[in-house]
Design a protein with these regions (language model features):
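Sec-dependent N-terminal signal peptides
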Residues: 4-14
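Glycan-recognition and catalytic cores of secretory/periplasmic carbohydrate-active enzymes
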Residues: 21-198
């Protein structure tokens, strides 16, 4: 009798989970993307009046911002470009351009390897989605800046200059995220030097 009851309950449970009320995957994805767009717009609206600031994290119930020097500064503009790519909302495009512009000064960064993902997440996606030629100059200047971190004797791009008393030539896996911009620069200019650095 125990086995019968166990199998009956298991059968009822499985029948209840059969999925007859499940939404198609496409619907679930569309809802998730619509929610992401709403949340991204809320963040962009909140930060639009904070000149030069970019969202960074949430700590102790408060949002924390950064300027463009933070190593992840290109990520939020990149998110805006991806959200724009999905829905083609003109408001998202406006914010993507605004927050991308906030990162432009990093094209001259030569003291760390982060310039690749500061710029390629933002300006790279902006160029890909809009064809805005002004973004090319930013990316090329950034690629030249990043290439200054390469040391031919070592064959690598140095990650940082700090802690020289601990590290001779620090290189971390994040460097891989910078290579795409260098490959783009070689393809765009026909100059193999960027590819060779990568």
């Amino acid at each position: 009798m125990k086995k019968f009851l166990t199998y009956t309950l298991l059968g009822v449970l499985l029948a209840g989970c059969a999925g007859s009320g499940r939404e198609p995957l496409e619907t679930v994805v569309d809802k998730a993307l619509a929610g992401a767009e709403r949340q991204t717009l809320l963040m962009a609206e909140k930060y639009s009046a904070r000149e030069g600031r970019l969202p960074r994290t949430w700590e102790n119930g408060e949002d924390v911002s950064s300027d463009s020097r933070w190593w992840c500064s290109g990520f939020f503009p990149g998110v805006l470009w991806y959200v724009y790519e999905n829905g083609r909302n003109p408001r998202v495009l406006e914010y993507a351009r605004m927050f991308t512009a906030r990162v432009e000064r990093e094209k001259h960064t030569t003291d760390n390897h982060d310039v690749g993902f500061m710029l390629y997440c933002s300006f790279g996606n902006g160029l890909r989605l809009t064809g805005d030629k002004s973004y090319e100059e930013v990316l090329l200047t950034g690629a030249r800046s990043l290439a200054t971190r390469f040391k031919p004797e070592v064959g690598l791009i140095r990650s940082w200059d700090h802690n020289r008393d601990k590290w001779q030539y620090p290189v971390i896996i994040d460097n891989m995220m910078n290579l795409e911009m260098l490959f783009w620069a070689s393809k765009h200019t026909g100059d193999p030097v960027y590819r060779d650095v990568a």
